[in-house]
Amino acid sequence: MKKIITSFPNLLLSILLCFVLSSCSSTGVKMSDSSPWKTIQFQDQANALDVDFIDNNNGFLVGSNRLIMESNDGGETWEKRNLDLPSEENFRLIDIDFKGQEGWLIGQPSLVMHTLDAGKNWTRLSLGNKLPGQPYLITTVDDGVAELATTAGAIYQTSDSGESWNAKVLDASGSGGVRDLRRTDKGDYVSVSSLGNFFSTLENDSNSWIAHQRASSKRVQSIGFNPEGSLWMLSRGAEIRFNEDTNDLENWSKPIIPILNGYNYLDMGWDPNGDIWAGGGNGTLIVSKDQGKTWNKYPIAAELPTNYIKIVFLDKEALDNQKGFVLGERGYILKWNS
């Protein structure tokens, strides 16, 4: 009798486990023999946070500890540059964006810089002390026109190269603060609240954020747009989801869990072939060539002592071929060579 009573809780646990697994899609991961990525390691141990190119050869990479580097050979090699900033100020340079020779660079705390000559000279702009939150995302819209988004969900636009800024959002509280924020070329935004308990959207012609419930009890890690404009979501527990109806942002696919290694995915990106890449902690970099049904893992990426925090594929008119980078911590990045 005691044996029967002891085994009954185990039976319940097994049934519960089967139920949980049936609600997920666990694809398994194969190891690829070759990789389209080239490893680049900087002597500086700072974390790379963003990269952008002006043309096929000239580009800039920015990161923590005031890191700014320039490439003149398409990203094969990089040289460290210095900004005219007080030595006692330690900025996290988090975003950089160019359109032609004009570019914008933002950092934390409260840094916005502007260039008109492809990064040869940078001018620091004053934001005053009334800006809600810290700069998070900068987009070069047109000549002298840029949009600045902050960690508070506020969005400002300048039409005079940063001399003045006008608010585009009447009430930023609907975003719940920001832990992740993305923008489409059309000017639509999506953000994850600071606690990851919901996400919000902002259409280009709207001045208010709309909050949406997350897809499950798991907190949202990051969210973004695929090339067609649909949303994807990365949640705690290494879960990947895709929105199945752009008119219904509560309608999400079952969670896809390619690897159960205890590390979360931090970003996703689509390469020129339409393959989906996901990167995360402990050197995790995986790819799906069939829209998320199956996934492959790359050994070169897994061998590096880093977390992959951002995946960037640059597709702009100034570039003959799309460029790709995976940005990691501790001075590691990967460059797309396919």
From Swiss-Prot:
Spell out the InterPro entries in the cross-references: PSII_CF48-like_dom, WD40/YVTN_repeat-like_dom_sf, Ycf48/Hcf136
Q: What keywords sit in the KW lines?
A: Lipoprotein, Membrane, Palmitate, Photosynthesis, Photosystem II, Signal, Thylakoid
Q: What does this protein do?
A: A factor required for optimal assembly of photosystem II (PSII), acting in the early stages of PSII assembly. Also plays a role in replacement of photodamaged D1 (psbA). Assists YidC in synthesis of chlorophyll-binding proteins.
> Which first-to-last residue range defines the signal peptide?
1-23
Q: Does the keyword Cell division apply?
A: no
> Main location per UniProt?
membrane
* PROSITE patterns xref list: PROKAR_LIPOPROTEIN
Topology in the lipid bilayer is annotated as: Lipid-anchor
Any one annotated GO CC term? thylakoid lumen
Q: Does the keyword Cell inner membrane apply?
A: no
Q: How does it assemble?
A: Part of early PSII assembly complexes which includes D1 (psbA) and PsbI; not found in mature PSII. Binds to the lumenal side of PSII complexes. Interacts with YidC.
Q: Where is the lipid attached (N-palmitoyl cysteine)?
A: C24
Protein name, entry field = Photosystem II assembly lipoprotein Ycf48
Question: Where found?
Answer: Cellular thylakoid membrane
Quick one: where's the S-diacylglycerol cysteine lipidation?
C24
